């Protein structure tokens, strides 16, 4: 199962292996494609969350979650003061929603879970992350002929880019070993100097605040997804999930 998951990329390796997969996100309409059942769900609504827990309790082998990072990511720190003035509890509320993902997994009887968020306030408001990686560090799990299936103009083949990503996980989750590839060399969009851009290419090459831009910038690294499956699928079999 995957929460706050628009692309479904975190589930694709599992679906391809024959697992029953469910993706919940407010952007979805109810549909089934590529072996994944997508459901519209407002995961900020407690009644919706409880319905999901009751539906899947005792049947879930692994839960991945990608809660909204708009109010938590360090990249948006310059706006925090203004947001706090308008709504003093905005950040604590966002952190609580992220932490709730772990509670959902545990309530379903699944201790193999992980919550993903970029570097930011969640490390202070919840706890330090259990694992940190750049997408390029798992690019070796993808084919040498890889091309991103959804956003090829923006996301390099084999996830060959840097974007510091934090993982909080449960005791049943196995952190996969890294298989790094060399990150792409690009021109920094702001300083016009050569070298490895300090921004992910999809951040440097996109502008505006559209939902599509947000989806591209937050797309699950596919190398990480493949690595998670490879490291964890045997344990889901042993648990009988």
Positions of predicted regions on the chain:
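Rossmann-fold NAD(P)-dependent oxidoreductase module
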Residues: 13
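A conserved beta-strand element that flanks and buttresses the S-adenosyl-L-methionine
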Residues: 64
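Class I S-adenosyl-L-methionine
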Residues: 3, 42, 50-57, 69-240
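An acidic- and aromatic-residue-enriched active-site/binding cleft used to recognize and process polar
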Residues: 5, 26-29, 118
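Class I SAM-dependent methyltransferase "Motif I" SAM/SAH-binding loop
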Residues: 2-8
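Adenosine-cofactor binding site in Rossmann-like domains, unifying the SAM/SAH pocket
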Residues: 16-54, 125, 130-132
């Amino acid at each position: 199962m995957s929460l706050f998951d628009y692309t479904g990329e975190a589930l694709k390796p599992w679906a391809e292996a024959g697992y029953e997969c469910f993706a919940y996100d407010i952007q979805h309409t109810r549909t089934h494609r590529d072996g994944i059942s997508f459901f519209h769900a407002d995961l900020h609504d407690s009644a919706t969350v409880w319905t999901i827990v009751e539906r899947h309790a005792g049947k879930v082998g692994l839960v991945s979650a990608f809660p909204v990072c708009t109010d938590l990511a360090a990249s948006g720190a310059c706006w925090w003061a203004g947001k706090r003035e308008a709504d003093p509890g905005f950040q604590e509320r966002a952190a609580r929603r992220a932490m709730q993902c772990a509670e959902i997994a545990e309530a379903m009887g699944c201790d193999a879970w992980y919550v993903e968020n970029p570097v930011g306030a969640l490390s202070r408001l919840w706890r330090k992350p259990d694992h940190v990686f750049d997408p390029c560090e798992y690019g070796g799990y993808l084919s040498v002929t890889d091309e991103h299936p959804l956003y090829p103009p923006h996301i390099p083949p084999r996830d060959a880019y840097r974007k510091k990503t934090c993982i909080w996980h449960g005791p049943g989750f196995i952190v996969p070993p890294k298989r790094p590839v060399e990150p792409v060399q690009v021109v920094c969009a702001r300083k016009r100097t050569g070298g490895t851009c300090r921004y992910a290419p999809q951040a440097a090459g996109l502008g505006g605040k559209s939902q599509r831009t947000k989806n591209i910038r937050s797309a699950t690294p596919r190398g990480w997804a493949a690595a998670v499956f490879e490291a964890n699928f045997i344990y889901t079999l042993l648990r009988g999930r």
